[in-house]
């Protein structure tokens, strides 16, 4: 059993090291994790530091250097073409995994629950709503999950058979929302119809765990983005 994991890096060697070390420490999996690094060159010297660090670990099966980055969706699309496993984790360099994450449990959820296409690892205790959108706690095959209103780019594990044929490598730094606009076109012009139940049917996006589940990671990159 294999999971492919992309670390999305952008000229921030200090953050990259914290992120990678946290993954090595806290990811728990009985199978193989195939690590891949995408380095977007926003600063040549800092990116070279990132690459030297990655190469020193002998951890990454693939190290891709993008000299002219066109946005995060394009970066992800480049790596998706190299994914071999049925499950894919996208992890940004500015997220630190702060507690153990059982990937065997995630795979079991995917295998037993065909409606689940994405599991997001929350950055804070899972709340009952987000921006006025009311979440729903569900239980499938003994696992408690909470609906998520969007396709989350990071940090999350994806069902490749669902997302790969739908993926659009939208250019620009608002590509996440453009991508979601494509995936959520059924609600375009009718946002009132976007309920937790309809998200389950259309997207299959969930937070791992019930309402109140403690956060799995912290975001370190506030005001540290070099993207323009």
Feature map (PLM): residue ranges:
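Short, acidic, metal-binding catalytic loop of nucleotide-sugar glycosyltransferases
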Residues: 21-32
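Short beta-strand-to-loop element that shapes/binds the nucleotide-sugar donor at the catalytic cleft/hinge
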Residues: 117-133
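Active-site nucleotide-sugar/metal-binding loop of Leloir-type enzymes
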Residues: 77-87
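Conserved donor-nucleotide/metal-binding helix-loop-beta segment in metal-dependent transferases, i.e.
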Residues: 100-122
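Short beta-strand/loop segment that forms part of the nucleotide-sugar
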Residues: 31-44, 64-65
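C-terminal catalytic/acceptor-binding lobe
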Residues: 18, 151, 155-161, 165-228
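Short beta-strand-to-loop acidic/aromatic patch adjacent to the donor-nucleotide binding site
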Residues: 86-96
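N-proximal low-complexity "stem/linker" segments adjacent to membrane-targeting elements
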Residues: 1-21
């Amino acid at each position: 059993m294999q999971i492919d994991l992309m670390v999305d890096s952008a000229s921030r060697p200090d953050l990259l090291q914290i992120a990678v070390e946290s993954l090595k420490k806290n990811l728990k999996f009985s199978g193989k994790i195939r690590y891949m690094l995408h380095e977007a060159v926003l600063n040549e010297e800092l990116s070279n530091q990132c690459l030297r660090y990655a190469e020193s670990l002998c951890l990454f099966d693939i190290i891709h250097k993008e000299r002219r980055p066109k946005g995060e969706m394009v970066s992800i699309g480049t790596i998706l073409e190299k994914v071999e496993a049925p499950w894919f984790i996208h992890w940004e360099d500015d997220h630190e995994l702060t507690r153990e994450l059982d990937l065997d449990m995630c795979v079991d959820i995917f295998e037993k629950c065909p409606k689940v296409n994405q599991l997001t690892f929350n950055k804070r205790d899972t709340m009952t709503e987000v921006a006025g959108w009311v979440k729903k706690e569900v239980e499938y095959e003994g696992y408690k999950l909470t609906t998520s209103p969007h396709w989350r780019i990071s940090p999350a594990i994806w069902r490749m058979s669902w997302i790969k044929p739908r993926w659009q490598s939208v250019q620009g730094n608002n590509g996440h929302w453009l991508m979601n606009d494509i995936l959520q076109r059924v609600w375009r012009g009718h946002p009132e119809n976007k309920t937790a139940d309809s998200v389950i049917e259309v997207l299959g996006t969930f937070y791992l765990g019930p309402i109140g589940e403690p956060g799995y990671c912290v975001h370190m990159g506030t005001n540290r983005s070099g993207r323009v």
